[in-house]
């Protein structure tokens, strides 16, 4: 990984996304800080860094499509597909299938028969990533691994690896001065 880019991203995430105070995470766990990574993934400079760093992090994984559970994964996937390198397409996993139109759970690029990278913005327990993994597998996709921008160090890596999947992250809480 380009260390200067990684340090710059950590600085941006710390400045834009770290919120101090007691919060309830999506897992139901309590924390004394929150990493609202959408503030970084939707920032012009941070998004470009995320795209480059995620491509670098997963360069040895052979995948053609990237995405994950909406909403956190969406800007991460878009950053990756717009980062320089080989062509990669994106998809979005809805939390629930639509009840009208095509009633799809997965929108965007087709995942059936494809090698797929599942992404997240921030990982806590890995539940969101694993929800996306199951949806992709049910749709006929081959998940090559899971990558996240920030790993909170609270069980996501272990849960994802327990499912037999590769797992990597760009940053940990220590990189943000929180660990």
Curated annotation (Swiss-Prot):
Its cofactor is Mg(2+). Keywords: Glycosyltransferase, Magnesium, Pyrimidine biosynthesis, Transferase. Pfam families: Pribosyltran. It comes from the Bacteria. Pathway: Pyrimidine metabolism; UMP biosynthesis via de novo pathway; UMP from orotate: step 1/2. It catalyses: orotidine 5'-phosphate + diphosphate = orotate + 5-phospho-alpha-D-ribose 1-diphosphate. One of its GO terms (molecular function) is orotate phosphoribosyltransferase activity. One of its GO terms (biological process) is 'de novo' UMP biosynthetic process. Orotate binds at residues 124, 152. Its EC number is 2.4.2.10. Homodimer. Catalyzes the transfer of a ribosyl phosphate group from 5-phosphoribose 1-diphosphate to orotate, leading to the formation of orotidine monophosphate (OMP). Belongs to the purine/pyrimidine phosphoribosyltransferase family. PyrE subfamily. This is Orotate phosphoribosyltransferase. The lineage of its organism: Bacteria, Bacillati, Actinomycetota, Actinomycetes, Mycobacteriales. The gene is pyrE.
């Amino acid at each position: 990984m380009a260390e200067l880019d990684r340090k710059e991203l950590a600085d941006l995430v710390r400045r834009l996304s770290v919120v101090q105070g007691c919060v309830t995470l999506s897992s139901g766990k309590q924390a004394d800080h929150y990493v609202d990574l959408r503030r970084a993934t939707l920032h012009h400079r941070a998004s470009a860094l995320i795209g480059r760093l995620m491509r670098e992090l997963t360069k040895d994984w052979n995948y053609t499509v990237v995405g994950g559970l909406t909403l956190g994964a969406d800007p991460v996937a878009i950053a990756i597909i717009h980062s320089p390198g080989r062509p990669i397409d994106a998809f979005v996993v809805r939390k629930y299938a639509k009840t009208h139109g095509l009633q799809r759970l997965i929108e965007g690029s087709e995942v059936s028969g494809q090698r797929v990278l599942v992404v997240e913005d921030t990982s806590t327990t890995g539940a969101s990533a694993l929800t996306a993994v199951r949806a992709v597998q049910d749709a006929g996709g081959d998940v090559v691994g899971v990558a996240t921008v920030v790993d909170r160090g609270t069980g996501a890596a272990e849960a994802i690896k327990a499912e037999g999947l590769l797992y990597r992250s760009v940053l940990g809480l220590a990189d943000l001065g929180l660990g």
